[in-house]
Amino acid sequence: MPSHITESRIHGGAYSSPEFAAIFSDANQVQKWLDVETALAATQAQMGLIPHEAAREIARVASVELLDLDALGREGLETGHILVPTLRALQGLCADGLGEYVHYGVTTQDILDTGLILQIRDAWGLVVQRLRGIRGHLLTLALRHKHTPMVARTHGQHALPTTFGYKVAVWVDEIDRHLERFEEAYARVMVGNLTGAVGTLAGLGPQGLEVQRRTLESLGLSAPLSSWHSARDRILEAAWLLVQASATLGRVANEIYHLQRTEIDEVREGRRAGQVGSSTMPHKQNPSTVDLISALSRLVRGQMVALTDAAFQMHERDGTTWRIEWAALPELFIYAGALLARMEGLLQAGLQVREARMRSNLDLLGGLILSERVMLALAPRCGKQTAHHLVHDIALQAQDAGVCFRDALLGDPRLRGCFSAQTLDDLLDPTAYTGLAAEMVDLVATKARPRASGDGAEAVMATQGNTSQSLYATEGM
């Protein structure tokens, strides 16, 4: 019976993603352990350390489908050990006593850590794929609206005109940096570890480094220079990349949320058939998807707090902190996977960009949004600081008197002869003061597109749990 929100049928899978849930499922985790054991045995056989028939037999039976996961869980509670039940089951499946060669010369954390890196690699490709999809949708939006004027807001207040396309291009540029980080970090993160009980490779003997190198190479991983049982920076880096990307997408969602506020109403989520905003207010159209994305972003970040605690390992290995990873890391990836899927789905369905409302909002302050432009036009006559003082004074008077900025400027005796009415009308045209916004959209669009390593997601196991989830939130208020 599901009790965690990532498995909840009531929430319609809103907090999870089938692909990421499959990667971090019990079945896939155990299969990764078996894959590592199989690769180790194959290498040891090639090097003459164990019989070839033992390696072949281990490979023949190393399938999670042959194991009873519930039984493994019960035995894990009895033994107090997470891997021993799997090792015993694998040994029992091997014929002719060849199971004696299972797990030869390594320790539990070798198998679990290397298996975890294999899971992270599977997820890595999906993350990059989703980010690229999101980037593509946003870039299309940025180019479409690179000349669409709107209010730029600083400290929550109207500041200057900008364009909606430029706002979106800033998001694209940020996502590109995340993709670059994923590319740069790939080689550092995709490193296994088969260094034995205390990291010295004593159990693998004089050929230990070669056994480790060959085994990890067969799994598509690099070998470490030293044990990382207690050095969790690779796990932290993988998690932190997701936290950063999730923070960006959470910020994008939060921006859409506020732009959809009734008083602003410049951007709306696409409306879906059957969507209900409120159980008691029939008119409501709540931003339910960006609601969820924003919440997921915070949940991803919350798991990072636990993972940093897991980095405080004592001595050569420490279960008191290592166990934190077992809970926090899968949740972080699953929440992030849900967030990425929801954002891509939102953009694929299309945002409603309300250009007329953007234009009318530019006029809400009666021209005051162009105060900088007026000040800079005055500066050659009287100096920038004096111009700032004059325009600031006139702007405050206009707001207090409730008159438009144009009339206040024309009526101020200090500015007599400075501007004709036509010149002032031109200066106060918000569509003509968006700076180089459109050009910068083109710069973002034409720069070299990041190529992130691991962008081809490896095949994941058949989706488990609720596979009928929507890409959108299903909850109203």
Placement of each model-derived feature along the sequence:
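Glycine-rich cofactor-pocket loops
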Residues: 143-165, 266-277, 283-284, 315-324, ...
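A short, charged helix-loop
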Residues: 210-229
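Long, amphipathic alpha-helical stalk/connector segments used for oligomerization, subunit docking
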Residues: 292, 299-385
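C-terminal alpha-helical interaction appendages
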Residues: 349-418, 434, 439-446, 450-457
